[in-house]
Amino acid sequence: MNFDIPEFLPALPEIAVLGMGCVLLLAVAYGGGQSGKIAYWITQLTLVIAALLTFYFLDYSSQSVTFNGSYIKDSLSDTLKLFIYIIVFAVFLYSRDYLQARALDKGEFYVLGLFGVLGMMVIASAHHFLTLYLGLELLSLSQYAMVALLRNNRWASEAAMKYFVLGALASGMLLYGMSMIYGATGDLHVAAVAEGIGGSGSSQVLVFGVVFIVVGLAFKFGAVPFHMWLPDVYHGAPTAVTLYIGTAPKIAAFALLMRLLVEALGDVQAHWQDMLIILSVLSMAIGNVVAIAQTNLKRMLAYSTIAHVGFLLLGILTGTGVGYAAAMFYVIVYALMSLGSFGMIIFLSRSNFEADRLEDFKGLNERSPWFAFMMLILMFSLAGVPPTVGFYAKWAVIMAIIDKELLWLAVVAVLFSVIGAFYYLRVIKFMYFDSPTEEISLSKRADFRWCMSANGLAMLGLGIFPGALMGLCVAVLG
């Protein structure tokens, strides 16, 4: 391979994040008592630098493939990376006070989070199966360690162990599927695999490889019946870690799905479409029904995530540009909604108190009317109530599957959306119709309050004016 300077330019954001990650490691090691504060500012600066570099080299009219075909810079990768930077920036901002109150502000959270971002970036730009796998493992290993940050907490240790064991199982299935694809096509480059399948058609080995890849992806997404790790991890992990896991990595998982199923295995859509239909219906059914019985808000949002994964898969299984664009719109919007929802749990939390029970939101309207209104917008958006952006996201996906003449699937999606609205409205009932159980004032940094307000209002603004974001998704995938 000819390592000339232009070949490294498309990967400059990844190189910058890797370099700053090494600087961050040194800063944490030698920062002493100020290591947490230093790590926070270095991490946020790194995300800003990466965003500026990505934006500077942004070009929707062309794409470049480098590193011997294992890395691609295209409109999909650049767009997803920009949203990853924005969301992770907000995650670190929301988490700062939470970590300080629990003596977790030592720098490890930011180091692991930044290397997780690097893993997401690699996934978004991967053009080779092994590059995809390496990016996925970098992200996964960072998340396993983050879940176990509270070493002396039984719930966190149990969640980390479950996450690690089941994550390793999913990675093994994904890798085994990739090896079977290699056996069937003789290559692991995304474009070469697609070309090989188009030239020779499907074989039994190829179909088995597709099955293992879909199962591995379902594990990583938390789709039913491979969802058993997700509620325990969301509940057991510190809320700051749950906030991280439940937002930006979903965008990276969407990129993984697009690179593997759509770009590499698009010609065998007939084999994976039926599997995605089953995963989607089961996820919407189990996710929405089980969420109704939850009294812990983090567990409720975990089952809500499973239901939203089902909706996301609906867009992918259409096999059309409109469906892919709707799915991309949905995953970005979901990440923003999840960001605000877990951010509100952190907003109510304080030292030695996790505001993760539904009862903790009782009477929030009396204690803080503005942030009760923000939570109302977020819950309405997750439920898909107009005029929030959650309604438009679901409508776009449903229209895409109707265009594909899968009318029965659209009816199922609408039915489970109506069922799912119940548990979101229950949170609103606690905030507005119940009396507060305590009168403790809610105080957070000004930057937290401004960011949370922007997060909530964005759900309303994007719902009223969805054209810009949807136009971007259509330009990338439609």
Swiss-Prot record:
- Tell me the membrane topology, using the record's own terms: Multi-pass membrane protein
Its main localization is membrane
| One GO BP | ATP synthesis coupled electron transport
Top-level enzyme category: translocase
Annotated EC: 7.1.1.-
Per UniProt, what is one Pfam family of this protein?
Proton_antipo_M
Reactions catalysed, semicolon-separated, are: a quinone + NADH + 5 H(+)(in) = a quinol + NAD(+) + 4 H(+)(out)
> Per the UniProt record, which residue ranges are transmembrane?
8-28, 38-58, 75-95, 109-129, 130-150, 164-184, 206-226, 238-258, 275-295, 306-326, 328-348, 371-391, 405-425, 457-477
Q: Where in the cell is it found?
A: Cell inner membrane
Signal peptide residues on this chain, from the entry's feature table: none
Recorded GO molecular functions are:
NADH dehydrogenase (ubiquinone) activity; NADH:ubiquinone reductase (non-electrogenic) activity; quinone binding
Keywords per UniProt: Cell inner membrane, Cell membrane, Membrane, NAD, Quinone, Translocase, Transmembrane, Transmembrane helix, Transport, Ubiquinone
Q: Which GO terms describe its cellular component?
A: plasma membrane
Functional summary from the UniProt entry: NDH-1 shuttles electrons from NADH, via FMN and iron-sulfur (Fe-S) centers, to quinones in the respiratory chain. The immediate electron acceptor for the enzyme in this species is believed to be ubiquinone. Couples the redox reaction to proton translocation (for every two electrons transferred, four hydrogen ions are translocated across the cytoplasmic membrane), and thus conserves the redox energy in a proton gradient.
Its subunit composition reads: NDH-1 is composed of 14 different subunits. Subunits NuoA, H, J, K, L, M, N constitute the membrane sector of the complex.
User: Which protein family is named in the record?
Assistant: Belongs to the complex I subunit 2 family.
Recorded protein name is NADH-quinone oxidoreductase subunit N 2
Organism of derivation: Nitrosococcus oceani (strain ATCC 19707 / BCRC 17464 / JCM 30415 / NCIMB 11848 / C-107)
